[in-house]
C-alpha cells in the first residue's frame, strides 16, 4: 500500500520588541539569568498584566504580511498546565479568539508546480521560562531562568496542507523571509527566535481520511524539520503496514541519530477566558493604518526587479529573499552600477566574503558606496576582475577608497594602445616559434602569446585590448 503524509506546522516566533508582552521588563532572554523580571512576569499575587502596544503592532504587521485577516476582536485565555517553567500554572494565549485568521504562503512543489499552503490562524501568547538542566556533584538539578518568561510570541498554526518534507521546508523559508521583511523578528531557528513543531500522520494515498497524528519537537533548523518529517513519515508508514497502531503522543527529533524518540503522551490543558487582560478591539481605521505601514513584500519586489532591471526570475527571487541583500542591491543601482554587474558581484563575491567573516551585510565595512566605486573602476577597464577581487578583500580591512588602494598597489590596468603595442611587438620578437604555430593554423598559440604579454606587463595589461591588438598583428603577418 502506498501512503501519503498529512502535515501541519505550529511555528512560534519571538517578536523583537524592546519589552515583554505584559510588562516593561527588557525583552533580552540572553542576559544574566533572572535579571529581567518583575512581579508581573513572575506572576506574583495581585500583579496585573498590561498588553504591550509595540507587541500588538508588530504582531499585526506580521499577520498582514502573511495575508491573514486581523479580527475585530481577540482575547487572551489561560492555557492551564503545570510545569516548573510556568509558576502561575497557566500561559496567557489566544485559544478561542485569535488575533488573525487565514492567510498563507505560495511555494513551488518538487515538480515545479505552484502550491498554496494555507494558514488557519495566528495568535499572540507569552513565552515561558527557560529550564537549564545541570549536574551538581552526582545529582541532576534543574534551574529556571525567568528572563524569557513573558517574552512576546506569535504562534502561526497552518492548515494540514503539507504532503512532503519539501513543502514544510519551503514554507518555513518563505515564512522567514516574510517575517523579516515586516521587521517583526530575526526569525532564526538557530537562535531560538523561530521554533517549529510538526504534526504528522499518514494515510493511504488517494483517500481523504485524517488519522492519528504525532507531534515532533526539538528541530533546530529548517533542514532538521525536513529530516524529521521524512523520518516520521517512514516510521509511521512502516507501523501501519505492519498492523501496528499509531498512538497520539509527542516525539523528540535527535539530529545525531537522525531519528525521533518518544517524549510524552500528548496533553492539551484546558483553556479558560482570562479576566485580567481586556479584549483587543481593532477598528477598521487602525487596521488600515497598519496595512499602510507594510513594506514592499518579497514577491512584489522580485517582480519589480525583473521588470525594471532585466533580471531573470531566479535572480530576482534570490536577491529579494533577504531584505538586506535586496536593499544593498538597490543601493548599488542608485550609485549608477549596471544592474547585472551589481547582481553578479554582490551574489558571487561580496556575500561570500561577508559569510566567510561571519558578518552581516548591514554591518560590513564594504558600504554600497565603496563597493560601487570599485565596480565602476572595473566597468571603465581601469582594473581587471582579478584586481577587483583583491581590492574587495582589502576593503574589509582598511578604510581607504578603492581608488587609493589601486594606486598604492600599482594595479591600475594598462589600456594605452601605444604602450601595449610595444609590449606585443617585444613578445612576438621573443617567441618566433609561437608566431609560426599561429600562422600554421594553431589558434591556441594566440593564448600562449597573450599570457606572455600579460606576464610582461606584470598583470596590468587590459586582456581584452591585448587580444584585439595581438590578433590584428598576427593576422597581418599572413
Swiss-Prot record:
GO terms for molecular function: asparaginyl-tRNA synthase (glutamine-hydrolyzing) activity; ATP binding; glutaminyl-tRNA synthase (glutamine-hydrolyzing) activity. It is an enzyme of class 6 (ligase). Its EC number is 6.3.5.-. Transmembrane segments: none annotated. It holds the Pfam family GatB_Yqey. SMART domains: GatB_Yqey. Keywords: ATP-binding, Ligase, Nucleotide-binding, Protein biosynthesis. InterPro entries: Asn/Gln-tRNA_amidoTrfase_suB/E, Asn/Gln-tRNA_Trfase_suB/E_cat, Asn/Gln_amidotransferase, Asn/Gln_tRNA_amidoTrase-B-like, GatB, GatB_C_1, GatB_Yqey_C_2, Gln-tRNA_amidoTrfase_suB_CS. GO terms for biological process: glutaminyl-tRNAGln biosynthesis via transamidation; translation. SUPFAM superfamilies: GatB/YqeY motif, Glutamine synthetase/guanido kinase. PANTHER family: GLUTAMYL-TRNA GLN AMIDOTRANSFERASE SUBUNIT B MITOCHONDRIAL AND PROKARYOTIC PET112-RELATED, GLUTAMYL-TRNA(GLN) AMIDOTRANSFERASE SUBUNIT B, MITOCHONDRIAL. Belongs to the GatB/GatE family. GatB subfamily. Heterotrimer of A, B and C subunits. Allows the formation of correctly charged Asn-tRNA(Asn) or Gln-tRNA(Gln) through the transamidation of misacylated Asp-tRNA(Asn) or Glu-tRNA(Gln) in organisms which lack either or both of asparaginyl-tRNA or glutaminyl-tRNA synthetases. The reaction takes place in the presence of glutamine and ATP through an activated phospho-Asp-tRNA(Asn) or phospho-Glu-tRNA(Gln). This is Aspartyl/glutamyl-tRNA(Asn/Gln) amidotransferase subunit B 1. It comes from Syntrophus aciditrophicus (strain SB).
